[in-house]
């Protein structure tokens, strides 16, 4: 049997070869008229295809952690954006229902994680269904497409903000405790912060505060009781900003009069809102929508990593100790 050359078919129809691949992969973005033309051409060349668009099964998987409601909101927004397309949606949680998740992977075409930092799960899903297209949101460790924030850049922005406000002697940065296993994004934020601050103020003392995520008891008040406490705290995540603000309140410290607080992600997680390194979640959803509707041809299993720019949003929680030089 003769081998079919998709590029020749594309030239015959005066379209791009990418469009031919999209029709073969049942992509939703190809117009009905173009789809029929491509299917007819494929059938003439002996590659028999059905012109009807088949509904695709999409797994929406989110982790049950402190930010699960935030992740669910992102996935629901994505689902609403794609509501007019023939998708079948299934919600899964791979950590608490791994057996069911892997079973659902067999018949799914797309899996969207928010997030998935576990390479083992990724490998197992690909073993069960090699054609499964995996998008990973808010984490850039694994996935065919990984859409995340530029955490290192965010840490650098935090360091510049504190430096410009005169906090150059004694600072603290909060990160998860090692047993929590959520180190990647938080670690990159802390690394960016440390690297930039060491460049700007080499003699600055920076304490690394490990805060357990799975304990109800807040250990931060003990750190804030020291006579030589830091002048500012960079909280590398939503949870840490909340905990730090609560610890300051419990210790009788006022923000920013007694101590400054700089957060990451959502300024309104504290009352009143704190200065924060933020990103636009709409961008994550928009890019996820684009890649679902325009599935790329990925060769050799090489993943595509997309990092979103960060920006500073100020609300007056960082006290200015001296003017910027």
Enumerate the language-model features and the residues they cover.
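N-terminal helix-turn-helix DNA-binding module of bacterial transcription factors
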Residues: 1-54
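Flexible loop/turn connectors
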Residues: 6, 221-325
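Short beta-strand segments enriched in small/hydrophobic residues
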Residues: 19-21, 53-67, 169-179
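Alpha-helical recognition/docking segments in bacterial nutrient-uptake
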Residues: 56-160
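Periplasmic-binding protein-like
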Residues: 59-61, 107-115, 171-178, 227-240, ...
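Short beta-strand elements in bilobed, periplasmic/extracellular small-molecule ligand-binding domains
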Residues: 79-93, 170-172, 190-215
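Hydrophobic alpha-helical segments within soluble ligand-binding/sensing domains
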Residues: 147-173, 214-222, 279-298
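An alpha-beta-alpha
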Residues: 158-200, 302-319
């Amino acid at each position: 049997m003769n081998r079919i050359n998709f590029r020749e078919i594309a030239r015959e129809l005066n379209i791009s070869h990418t469009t031919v691949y999209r029709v073969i992969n049942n992509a939703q973005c190809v117009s009905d008229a173009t789809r029929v033309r491509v299917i007819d051409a494929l059938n003439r060349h002996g590659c028999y295809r059905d012109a009807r668009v088949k509904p695709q099964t999409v797994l929406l998987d989110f982790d049950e952690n402190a930010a699960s409601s935030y992740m669910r909101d992102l996935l629901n927004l994505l689902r609403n954006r794609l509501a007019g397309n023939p998708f079948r949606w299934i919600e899964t949680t791979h950590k608490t229902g791994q057996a069911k998740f892997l079973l659902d992977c067999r018949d799914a075409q797309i899996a969207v994680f928010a997030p998935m930092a576990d390479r083992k799960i990724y490998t197992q899903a690909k073993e069960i269904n090699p054609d499964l297209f995996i998008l990973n949101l808010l984490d850039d460790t694994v996935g065919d497409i990984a859409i995340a924030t530029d955490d290192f850049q965010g840490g650098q922005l935090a360091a510049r903000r504190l430096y410009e406000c005169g906090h150059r002697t004694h600072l603290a940065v909060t990160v998860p405790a090692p047993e929590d296993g959520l180190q990647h994004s938080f670690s990159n934020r802390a690394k960016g912060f440390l690297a930039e601050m060491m460049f700007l103020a080499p003699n600055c003392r920076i304490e690394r505060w490990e805060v357990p995520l799975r304990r109800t008891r807040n250990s931060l008040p003990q750190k804030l009781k020291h006579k030589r406490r830091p002048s500012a705290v960079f909280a590398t995540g939503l949870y840490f900003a909340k905990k730090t603000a609560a610890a300051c309140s419990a210790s009788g410290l006022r923000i920013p009069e007694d101590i400054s607080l700089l957060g990451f992600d959502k300024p309104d997680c504290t009352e009143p809102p704190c200065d924060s390194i933020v990103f636009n979640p709409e961008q994550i959803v928009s890019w996820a929508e684009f890649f679902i509707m325009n599935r790329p041809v990925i060769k050799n299993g090489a993943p595509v990593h997309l990092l979103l720019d960060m920006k500073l949003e100020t609300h007056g929680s960082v006290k200015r100790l001296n003017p910027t030089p």
